[in-house]
């Protein structure tokens, strides 16, 4: 990652508890009050907003003498956005951090109008996000690239990472959904069904579909409940999951994807950041271009429609979209609710 002046940028690390404790109490309390009232947000969204606001107020502590949030001015917030740009953040990342602060300000305007009647949101619509030129192309991985990635991970005996890649790609799920997978799924029975597909020569043929369904998983949606679904995956995924658990051995953690202490004495559910690190630091190196957890979802939809010649509606069912128009945006050229044609 490079700065606008050409130097290598430091990564914006998460704010530690010690750093957050140094932020003035007024700002910390306002952030907590705001977040506690956002009942429409999912746990993942709340985590993202909390992280963005903590980064901002640590910057305020370091650069604006730890002043109260209601005293911050527009020109000072512009300095913050320039700081983010100079740290090498993408325009999308800066835009989210801008919207997080703006949402907090709107909360203060609406809920504390009697306490602070002169306060106005200093993050305005006309305030442009700095043009960093750092906009990542949404290029799905081809079937050959997916095969290469899986082959290399198998050669390296990275069984957990291989299981993650196969599960995430096969289901087309988001990284917050992969996180919830329980290891009990390896004991589930397969669903077998004869389906009719259209091959690359536009001829119909009947083939057997073999797939599995997970336990209930909370997917993207408003509120803490969100949209609850059972994700569907193929036999190759089941084989990879079983291989990972065989290597992992017995432990008390119910989750499929985990982190262990060096001595292996403690095992716990893995965090979001690990999936990002795997993709950016290792999978990107294997594939030869930038890869993210969400790119597996986009790649699955594209390859299903463009390479496997399945109907757009099949990809729609697999990804859990309410409208095929949403699925179409993923496809880059980009039970009746099941996507059985995806598993033949």
Predicted regions and their residues:
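A short, basic/aromatic helix-end/turn motif that makes direct DNA contacts
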Residues: 180-190, 316-322, 330-333
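Conserved tyrosine-mediated DNA breakage-rejoining catalytic core shared by Y-recombinases
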Residues: 180-239
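DNA breakage-rejoining catalytic core of tyrosine-based enzymes
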Residues: 130-148, 204-209, 223-235, 250-254
């Amino acid at each position: 990652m490079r700065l606008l002046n050409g130097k290598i940028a430091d990564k914006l690390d998460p704010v530690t508890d010690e750093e957050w404790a140094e932020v003035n109490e007024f700002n910390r309390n306002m952030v907590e009050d705001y977040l506690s009232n956002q009942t429409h947000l999912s746990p993942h969204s709340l985590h993202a907003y909390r992280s963005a606001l903590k980064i901002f107020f640590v910057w305020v502590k370091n650069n604006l003498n730890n002043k109260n949030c209601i005293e911050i001015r527009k020109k000072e917030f512009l300095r913050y956005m320039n700081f983010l740009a100079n740290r090498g953040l993408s325009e999308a990342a800066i835009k989210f951090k801008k919207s997080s602060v703006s949402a907090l300000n709107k909360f203060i305007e609406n809920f504390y109008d009697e306490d602070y009647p002169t306060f106005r949101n200093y993050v305005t619509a006309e305030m442009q996000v700095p043009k960093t030129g750092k906009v990542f192309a949404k290029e799905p991985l081809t079937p050959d690239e997916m095969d290469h990635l899986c082959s290399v991970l198998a050669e390296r005996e990275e069984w957990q990472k291989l299981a993650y890649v196969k599960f995430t790609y096969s289901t087309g799920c988001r990284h917050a959904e992969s996180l919830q997978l329980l290891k009990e799924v390896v004991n589930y029975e397969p669903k077998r069904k004869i389906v009719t597909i259209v091959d690359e020569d536009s001829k119909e043929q009947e083939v057997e579909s073999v797939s599995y369904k997970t336990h209930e998983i909370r997917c993207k949606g408003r509120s803490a409940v969100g949209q609850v679904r059972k994700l569907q995956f193929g036999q190759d995924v089941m084989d990879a999951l079983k291989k990972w658990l065989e290597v992992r051995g017995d432990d008390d953690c119910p989750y499929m994807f985990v982190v262990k202490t060096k001595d292996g004495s403690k095992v716990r559910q893995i965090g979001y950041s690990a999936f990002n690190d795997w993709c950016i630091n290792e999978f990107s190196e294997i594939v030869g271009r930038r890869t993210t957890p969400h790119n597996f979802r986009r790649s699955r939809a594209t390859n299903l429609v463009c390479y496997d010649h399945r109907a757009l509606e099949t990809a729609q069912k697999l990804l859990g979209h309410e409208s095929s128009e949403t699925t179409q945006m993923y496809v880059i050229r980009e039970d009746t609710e099941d996507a059985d044609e995806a598993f033949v």
